[in-house]
Regions:
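Extracytoplasmic electrostatic interaction patches
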Residues: 94-169
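Intrinsic structural disorder/low-complexity segments
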Residues: 6, 38, 151-154
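Short intrinsically disordered, low-complexity segments
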Residues: 17-19, 55, 124, 137
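Sec-dependent bacterial lipoprotein signal peptides
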Residues: 1-19
Length: 169
């Protein structure tokens, strides 16, 4: 029953995220999780700045190799963080809180490999959800006490899924 609940919660979270994007017209802020993997920072910037609605993009590169971006559209700010390894996109996080998204991306991606920690406490809940057939990627959600929803993509790792879970422990 516990595993069944863990399966349903991310599905509900996905519904909330995507319906929220439609209502606030923030869909432009989300990159395609599969199509954009391996792209350079320049490719991502070019794609984002070409988006419609007169959106603006401000970005900065930190010493640890992360790109922090603020995407503004329709008067709404959406904070983006992208991680690049060897000049290739390996992960991204989005949030409407600049503090939250920076901490998220630093906690779960480093310059050499992807780190994931699943935890639950009274402040937030983290879920890992693997939809191997549809997205070939891992979709990571955080739903904290402030009601913020974040989505976090990493590439799906080929091989036995049990080996993948064991590697995370």
């Amino acid at each position: 029953m516990k595993h069944f609940k863990l399966f349903l919660l991310p599905l509900l979270a996905m519904t909330l995220v995507f319906s929220s994007c439609e209502q606030q017209d923030l869909s432009l802020t989300y990159i395609e999780p599969i199509q954009d993997w391996g792209k350079s920072p320049q490719d991502i910037l070019e794609k984002m700045t070409k988006s419609k609605s007169g959106a603006t993009l401000e970005y900065s590169e930190s010493d640890d190799g992360y790109y922090y971006m603020e995407f503004k559209s329709y008067g709404i700010s959406q904070y983006l963080a992208y991680a690049f390894i060897d000049n290739k996109l390996v992960g991204c996080a989005t949030s409407q809180s600049s503090i939250t998204y920076k901490q998220t991306i630093k906690n779960h991606i480093d310059k050499k490999h992807t780190l994931i920690q699943v935890d639950t406490n009274e402040d937030y809940e983290e879920y890992l959800y693997c939809n191997k057939e549809k997205t070939s990627s891992i979709l990571f959600f955080i739903d904290n006490i402030y009601g913020e929803m974040e989505q976090f993509y990493i590439p799906y790792i080929e091989g036995d899924i049990e080996d993948f879970w064991n590697a995370l422990e």
